[in-house]
Curated annotation (Swiss-Prot):
Disulfide bonds join C23-C38, C33-C51, C36-C46, C60-C75, C70-C89, C73-C84. Belongs to the protease inhibitor I19 family. Residues 1-19 form the signal peptide. Keywords: Cleavage on pair of basic residues, Disulfide bond, Protease inhibitor, Repeat, Secreted, Serine protease inhibitor, Signal. It comes from Schistocerca gregaria (Desert locust). It is found in: Secreted. Residues 20-54, 57-92 form the Pacifastin domain. One of its GO terms (cellular component) is extracellular region. PROSITE patterns: PACIFASTIN (PS51446). The record marks R48, K49, L86, K87 as: Reactive bond. This is Serine protease inhibitor I/II. Its main location: secreted. The keyword Repeat applies.
Length: 92
């Protein structure tokens, strides 16, 4: 059980996504709230943190819920703001 938990924790901490863009080994960059490092083979490997969404204008009926990708949002009392879950949605 401890081994399974340790493996899950390690997996969550070290989940990497390789971008299609080529790079120079050793380079680093930020992508939203994630950090990317260029691997020795010249491809980007980035963490996959669930970044807070960028603020944007919304128009919704106060108190209602709606989906934003895989996240659920609740419309604020002003009808112009919403609070959403921060799941890391799988890319399609």
């Amino acid at each position: 059980m401890k081994l399974a938990l340790a493996l899950c924790a390690a997996f969550l901490l070290v989940v990497l996504v390789q971008a299609e863009q080529e790079c120079t080994p050793g380079q680093t960059k930020k992508q939203d709230c994630n950090t990317c490092n260029c691997t020795p083979t010249g491809v980007w490997a980035c963490t996959r943190k669930g970044c807070p969404p960028h603020k944007r204008e919304v128009t919704c009926e106060p108190g209602t819920t709606f989906k934003d990708k895989c996240n659920t949002c609740r419309c604020g009392s002003d009808g112009k703001s919403a609070a959403c879950t921060l799941k890391a949605c799988p890319q399609k």
